[in-house]
Amino acid sequence: MSFSVDVLAGIAIELQSGIGHQDRFQRLITTLRQVLECDASALLRYEGRQFIPLAIDGLAQDVLGRRFTLEGHPRLEAIARAGDVVRFPADSDLPDPYDGLIPDQESLKVHACIGLPLFAGQTLIGALTLDGMEPDQFDVFSDEELRLIAALAAGALSNALLIEQLESQNMLPGSSASFEQVKETQMIGLSPNMMQLKKEIEIVAGSDLNVLISGETGTGKELVAKAIHEGSPRAVNPLVYLNCAALPESVAESELFGHVKGAFTGAISNRSGKFEMADNGTLFLDEIGELSLALQAKLLRVLQYGDIQRVGDDRSLRVDVRVLAATNRDLREEVLAGRFRADLFHRLSVFPLSVPPLRERGEDVVLLAGYFCEQCRLRLGLSRVVLSPGARSHLLSYGWPGNVRELEHAIHRAVVLARATRAGDEVVLEAQHFALQEEVSPALPDDSTPTLPANHNLRDATEAFQREMIRRALAQNNHNWAACARALETDVANLHRLAKRLGLKS
């Protein structure tokens, strides 16, 4: 069989008729699967010694969330090194990265596999993979015909990457486009609200505006901050992180602004604060709502005038720092309650971003699950970790109050459990490996009274009451310990100690 001019023209037309890069990539993959009569096809982007799926057809949806490292996938490494069409024999001892990931064929191993590396000049930018269940499925196609397919795909991918770079170049004066500069963050998701968030990040990244990132605990606010920094002119300089909720009041000012020798007991030498460390770069202040009003006033001065004073020093230091702040609280409500300065809120929220909770991201749950499955596979040295159809449905039906962080932990626990109950280095996650309903205690009604143990003495009753109060406060505050401490009107450090004594923390 050979390709007719009409077939090649049809592929080219599909590439031009798509709306946006993602649609064009999907049209290409779907058309190739039909023309080549393969069971699965994928277009992958190459970056940082790993392949990142851009479009798939005939593969499980979670493949789009996986990141295939060369070290962990010898077939993909062979494709990256080859420079030409790669045909893997049916009896190849190199594991196929898609084994177990073709729907309705999970228990079967892929037999026929072809890899087409994609180049822009001499630079590897991606690959096309074609897989079939029959050993001789692709024998009818010559290498020359497959090279034509690769050339069409490479042209589409290189144009998309170049446009992406030119768009970034417009926002970053002085930059120049090159394929080596393309960098993909780990913000996985194709749901409409995640695509909107990514678009907003692209808009604000090239500016020097301060950004307030809001969202529930575990949604990935730190990843948003990293994406903003990496897309900014400051990307060559440091991104410095500070968790405001973990700062004791006694050292918070020193952590932010530094101190000089002798400023207080224990200050045995000069020490730079986070603002100095982030000079010409970016400072990410996580849980900004936990700062005291006194520190908020000093932070406001830095944002207004660009100078800081180390603790114990009368001199001012000039700093050039972009501030990204994150919170899981409604700072507007905090302003009304007098717990957060209105002027600081307005300084920080010039360009506010809201990170959607996982329950509002639809199929992104499956993509993220694939990403975490691949992480576990590499970490535990397994040949494959896949989700059964039942497991996918189970994950999609759950509400994820702990968001992406809870999903990550759930996948890791499920892999360990499944591995312990099945011999070998292949793990298939089933619905029963996830005890999701038991992982998060439902919030009690506000007017409920904690149940006391029967035949209790005073100590048991007191501990039972404390335990239930803490559980209720945690559930009502998205399992954020600092917010829980505020709700219970107690010190967060004391709350941690009490929770450990009551068996609520390990």
From Swiss-Prot:
The Swiss-Prot or TrEMBL record marks DNA binding at 481-500
Q: Which CDD domains match?
A: AAA
Query: Source taxonomy lineage?
Result: Bacteria, Pseudomonadati, Pseudomonadota, Gammaproteobacteria, Enterobacterales
Q: Where does ATP bind?
A: 215-222, 278-287
Q: Which Pfam families match?
A: GAF, Sigma54_activat
| Entry annotated with the keyword Ribosomal protein | no
Q: What does this protein do?
A: Required for the expression of anaerobic nitric oxide (NO) reductase, acts as a transcriptional activator for at least the norVW operon. Activation also requires sigma-54.
What pathway is this protein said to act in by its record?
Nitrogen metabolism; nitric oxide reduction
NCBIfam families per the UniProt record, alphabetical: PRK05022.1
- Cross-referenced Gene3D superfamilies: 1.10.8.60, 3.30.450.40, Homeodomain-like (1.10.10.60), P-loop containing nucleotide triphosphate hydrolases (3.40.50.300)
GO terms for biological process, alphabetical:
phosphorelay signal transduction system
Domain of life of the native organism: Bacteria
Q: Keywords assigned by UniProt?
A: ATP-binding, DNA-binding, Nucleotide-binding, Phosphoprotein, Transcription, Transcription regulation
* HAMAP family attached to this UniProt entry: NorR
Sigma-54 factor interaction domain mapped to chain residues = 187-416
Q: Does the keyword Magnesium apply?
A: no
Q: Which gene encodes it?
A: norR
Instruction: Select a single GO molecular function from the record's annotations and give it.
Output: DNA-binding transcription factor activity
Q: How is this protein named in the record?
A: Anaerobic nitric oxide reductase transcription regulator NorR
> 4-aspartylphosphate-modified residues are where?
57
- According to its UniProt entry, this protein's organism is Citrobacter koseri (strain ATCC BAA-895 / CDC 4225-83 / SGSC4696)
